[in-house]
Amino acid sequence: MLHFIGDSAKRINWQSYCDNGVTRVKEVSTILGAMGIAQKMGMELDDKALVTLVCSDKGDTYGIPANENVIEWSIDSRQVGTEDFVILYDLDVAPRWQIPKTSGTTIACLKARNLHLLKNMTLKDAKKPELIPVISMNDLRTNGASISKAISWERTAIDFLRDLHYGISREILDRYPFFVVLLEADGLIVRQQDTLTLYFIPSKAEGDSGSLENEELRNSVCTEIIRQIVSGKYDFTRVLPDTLSMQVLPCYEELEAPESWSILNEKYGRDRLEIIETAKRIVIHGEKEILNSVPSCKYGALQTVDRMEIESYRAIVNLMKKYAQDKDTRPLSLAVFGFPGSGKSFGIKQIAKTLGGFEIFVYNLSQFTSLRELEVAFQEIRDASIKGERLPLVFFDEFDSSFNGEPLGWLKTFLAPMQDGVFMEDGRERQIGRAVFVFAGGTSTSFQNFISQDQNLFRKAKGPDFVSRLKGYLNIQGPNPTSKEDKVYIIRRAMLLRSLIIRNAKQLLDSDMRVNIDENILYALLTTETYRHGSRSLEFFISMSPLLGEKKWSSSLLPPRSQMDIHVDAEEFMSKITILAMCKELAKISHEMYLEAELAKTPNKDLQAVTHWENLNETYKKSNIAQMQYHVERFNDFCIGIRQKSPNSEKFTFKDEDLLKLAMAEHERWCKERIADGWVYGEKRDNEKKIHPSLVPWEQLSEEEKQKDIDVILRIITLFDRIGLELYYK
């Protein structure tokens, strides 16, 4: 049974409607609070169990009238059974003394002023929770929690985990095995026993769908949460109207790098082969799969799923919005960094296009030879600012280039314009006016790279003074890996590749927007190590390939190697083209070697896999090919390359630690494959029932079983030798 106590309110609005061409208005009332939830859930109210505090109903106001000071919730606890739920709803109309205790489970929807009540509760050690708090993250912030908002879902989640360990959230929530924290109407964090789960709308930030200050919205969200709890379904993906994704949050103390933890990495960054398969689907079928599961942001034609880029873009957007609305007469100064061709100006321009009201100016400082040219640029900006039709958005490309032979020589010339909004013209000080300055790095690939230059040189060039005047910066990740730990660059590359194909080679798309591309070319485009000129090099492959009139991008339509080598390592790229075929050949040879060894041990061995490759079940063929491809991709993580065998080269030997890690990875791969195919653990192997005794963690394997995985890795050396290739440490 459900019991409802707490605040209720009637909100009266006037709604216009058309009656035979005549506009009329009618009174529409909405019941909020405890009674509103009971009404939404279709409950027949028991007056003895429901205490309703009637509120003002004037106009569109709600809340206890100021002259009433109701400080207690009351309920006859004798009416509440151990299996009952008490729904307590707080409209924050008055401070309270306590939360009533019952023998059932209380779901307490509390607001900021009464969160302190959660600190004083004494709980029994029972399997069924006595009290389930349902509160908002905003109210935790009001009570002093240091938790960011609307920067990224990851940042908010990690800040909350930190506060739950060390901050006010620990005092308020840590004792409760079950609680719900609302992230406006765009997400929620749920704790159930030892598991914390983030539910979120991938394409939005906290607050995009509306504020919980709107009590009608809060009532609707809380009603669905209560419905999921009392029904025992706990399907919190149904709480909000938009599609919700979910991510189990890590234990904060076990996080090695909280600032770089990302949902994209958690979902797709664990296994390189899985990343590649996901990237292939993005290029061929579109981004829907990934956009429905990981955080993203979109401004015009710009779309990203990279946490660092999302946080930077949103911070820049907030700065530009605020500047557009305020009255500051000095320019807003921003900086953007990235590898050549990473799209530094593209992102900012798309943001400006989305926000509207900007006029774009571009100046390349590396092409300026005198201060006079910069003065002319400032005058053009000043004229546009005085005109006032649109706000000047000014790109100073390669601002970190040398001037008059002095490294970073341009920096000091911008100090006065950035600080005071003035420049010198013919010896006179002139006002620049309102503008947004965007300094795009030419030699510095990141902000950290820019400020970590030779410090004597940096100070001499007034670098610290320049940095102190910046209001924000943006690091563009681009299509190349930014570090050894960057595993999901292939996802970024796939999204860029699809957008470039749609823009420059529409004929490759069928009626379902499916890209027709040879799997070998796609694999090479996604996995080649580096594009020498970033996204421009990727675009080159499309523009220089003879695709006009072609419906499919096949290997015969690639650019000449001489042109290709300008943008990638052509030899490496072409070797990638053959990897899939190579893996099939390696899988075939591997199976025949395995067959030969097994039959030598037991000539009449009765196993499904003991048959020649041509007669082998397709499931086993795919498994063997996937195994080869998996290890070829894993070699990248260990700086192991593949090349044509040389007559004078020494025999390759794995480092001991690499051999162990690769063997452990092979066992993990095999377990995942078997589990996905429906196999389960059992002490005795049974192929028909799909039972296998080796479906256990590596540490629980016998030495004999471990050696089998080690032998799989060692056999790879022989396999490559048979096809005229060899492994080597790069």
Model-predicted regions and their roles:
Residues 569-730:
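Alpha-helical propensity feature that highlights long, continuous alpha-helices across diverse contexts
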